[in-house]
């Protein structure tokens, strides 16, 4: 691993991308401690025992706990992305048309997603400031009034817009997917606090049951290792489809056709489905927390909690649904079949064109079924282990966070390796 990192740092353009990404993350961490005006964050910190608060705070790298300018994190952007991508499925004809226009269409959709993020962010900021103020018995907002709420909402929306821009800069000039890297950084920054909470609850003042607590922590370590191995396995697994190129094409050797393969990942969506599933579960619980405690809000808090049987079932269903959805966003069977036909390639025994598209679609459906089930299992595995061991809520959140951290780290390393291989290939061709 250290040798790989050393190889990355020897290449100037990759080194510059890594340094740029780290600088952007430093800016993100600084912003997490810049307070919003007219807010008494200590009043909100008193409510930190709420599970949804801990989850939001973890994904924001502690920004919500400080009620900083980045308190909303990147959640509005994730929500906007989900909605816009769902609307592309023949719901809004214009979006469907743009989705088929290649790079030009993607730019239009990305721009519309930005605008929608600002609108959602402003609405969420108003609701969050008003709701959390009620939750803190009116102690959160100083000099509460319409103008105060508007100023706070504008500052929070500006913070989310800046994070969105920061993520795009990392994607364009740094390494990895910018939004995922920001979520990754937020989670990693909360790990020391989570470890401290586990140590405090399991080992401080528990000398008479020390062995039992050691066993509990050992179970947690086993769950962590299982998640790491599981994520690596599911991210690396591919199905190779045999491809034959006809004689006389640019890919065929002088003596005739060439055989190769088309690799399809078992889980082409990565950990994006988990991020989206968590964001989907957070939203109703966050809204419910604004309205105090009653039968309805209790029902929402319980049934949208992924440690509750109903919430866990919803969580698993969302992961499977988003895995299928994103598999076909990342892999377009129609475009693949068309490209193969243009290049003179075909799957042995399958006619080029529509039949090839149907074969790729069929294989992708089967692969995604396996990938989605496996992803769902390794997502809930830490929850079972942690509940069985009786560890604190922060550890349960840490299980989901770990899945995202490992997945993002793996994808980023693969991207860096591909850039290194590409650069070495270019150097070889020049020589």
Curated annotation (Swiss-Prot):
Residues 39-66, 137-145, 199-213, 283-308 are extracellular. It is a multi-pass membrane protein. One of its GO terms (cellular component) is cell envelope Sec protein transport complex. Its main location: membrane. The keyword Lipid biosynthesis does not apply. It is found in: Cell membrane; Membrane raft. One of its GO terms (molecular function) is signal sequence binding. The keyword Cell membrane applies. It comes from the Bacteria. Residues 1-17, 88-115, 167-177, 235-261, 330-368, 411-431 are cytoplasmic. The chain crosses the membrane at residues 18-38, 67-87, 116-136, 146-166, 178-198, 214-234, 262-282, 309-329, 369-389, 390-410. NCBIfam families: 3a0501s007. Component of the Sec protein translocase complex. Heterotrimer consisting of SecY, SecE and SecG subunits. The heterotrimers can form oligomers, although 1 heterotrimer is thought to be able to translocate proteins. Interacts with the ribosome. Interacts with SecDF, and other proteins may be involved. Interacts with SecA. Interacts with FloT. The central subunit of the protein translocation channel SecYEG. Consists of two halves formed by TMs 1-5 and 6-10. These two domains form a lateral gate at the front which open onto the bilayer between TMs 2 and 7, and are clamped together by SecE at the back. The channel is closed by both a pore ring composed of hydrophobic SecY resides and a short helix (helix 2A) on the extracellular side of the membrane which forms a plug. The plug probably moves laterally to allow the channel to open. The ring and the pore may move independently. This is Protein translocase subunit SecY. The lineage of its organism: Bacteria, Bacillati, Bacillota, Bacilli, Bacillales.
